[in-house]
Amino acid sequence: MASRLGKMPIWQRYFVIGSIFLCSITGLMYLLVNDFHLTPLIFRPHTILSWHGLTAMAASMALGSVLTVHLKAGLKAKQQMVSGLGQLVCLLALILTAALLYYGPAELREHAITAHWVIGILFLGFFLGHMLHISCKQKALS
């Protein structure tokens, strides 16, 4: 169990970090292979996209697990507001643009693709910043 309010249990921390990193990596791989036409080393674009979809489902579950305690505690403590809320806004926008990619009108598809990968890269920056701040803070305390 967590030692302080808002700190995630170790299993949850690994689940959140793992699912978000896998989702980010597969998203970047798909972007490089499909949009920038880099030759895939092992996987074809459809396989990468399938893995991205599966890891996005896990990342959405991770988001749900964080909302109940971690986010609430962070808001109350007013710590890491920019990186935390930045991640939340980006994730909600990523879910919206993903829905537009699959269910939206064809004329919005290209805009949704561009928005999805730009927001995805922005999200990864917020996520890494959030993680690095926590890591530096933990090292300073020990």
Language-model features, listed with the residues they occupy:
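Membrane-embedded alpha-helical bundles that constitute the cytochrome b-like, heme-associated redox core
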Residues: 1-142
